[in-house]
């Protein structure tokens, strides 16, 4: 089977670019029962590469916490599309849909038999839908606008945020999974300003 784990100190992997690197115990890898097959979220390994002789493939559709990969690629002198994408963050809710779509396309174009899905996830799954404490009164103060509560809610909900009014003065707002860039009240106010216009 395929697992995701931390590398053993001194473990080595030959990457797709031909470079062999020595890993430390802070590096996340995708591995089989013997050794790493990929530097997680950065680059695949040469010994698991697809060739013209390949008959069986294993598709990876992953989410890695940006903090787990931050700086790892650069520390090995690597910069890949994958490392850039994962360091910036990807939607953690799309993995299964993406895997199903890719599998369907491969099956349609190339034929073949589709195998089972296996999942590797940590014991403690990261909670991604942290509610943001939001004071609606801050919107008009910061933006110089005169928006009503219903205007603010309409703006947020149009961007797929979930709003719960705990009281008139304090709301909780949960970002959609694809908006991992929204972390604080100021980010929400910026989104409202962008939608409603800063000169209202």
Where would I find each of the regions flagged by the language model?
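RNA/tRNA-interacting regions in translation and RNA-turnover enzymes
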Residues: 1-200
């Amino acid at each position: 089977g395929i697992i995701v784990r931390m590398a053993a100190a001194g473990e080595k992997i030959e990457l797709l670019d031909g470079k062999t690197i020595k890993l430390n115990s802070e590096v996340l890898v995708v591995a089989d029962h013997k050794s790493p097959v990929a530097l997680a979220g950065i680059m695949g390994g040469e010994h698991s590469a697809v060739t013209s002789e390949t008959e069986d493939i294993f598709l990876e559709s992953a989410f890695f916490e940006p903090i787990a990969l931050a700086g790892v690629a650069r520390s090995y002198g690597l910069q890949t599309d994958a490392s850039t994408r994962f360091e910036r963050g990807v939607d953690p809710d799309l993995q299964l849909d993406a895997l199903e779509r890719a599998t369907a396309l491969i099956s349609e174009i190339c034929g073949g038999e589709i195998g089972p899905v296996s999942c590797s996830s940590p014991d403690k799954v990261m909670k991604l839908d942290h509610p943001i404490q939001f004071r609606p009164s801050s919107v008009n103060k910061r933006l110089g606008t005169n928006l009503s509560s219903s205007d603010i809610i309409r703006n947020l909900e149009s961007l797929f945020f979930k709003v719960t009014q705990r009281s008139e003065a304090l709301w909780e707002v949960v970002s959609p999974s694809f908006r991992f860039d929204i972390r604080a009240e100021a980010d929400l106010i910026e989104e409202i300003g962008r939608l409603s216009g800063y000169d209202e």
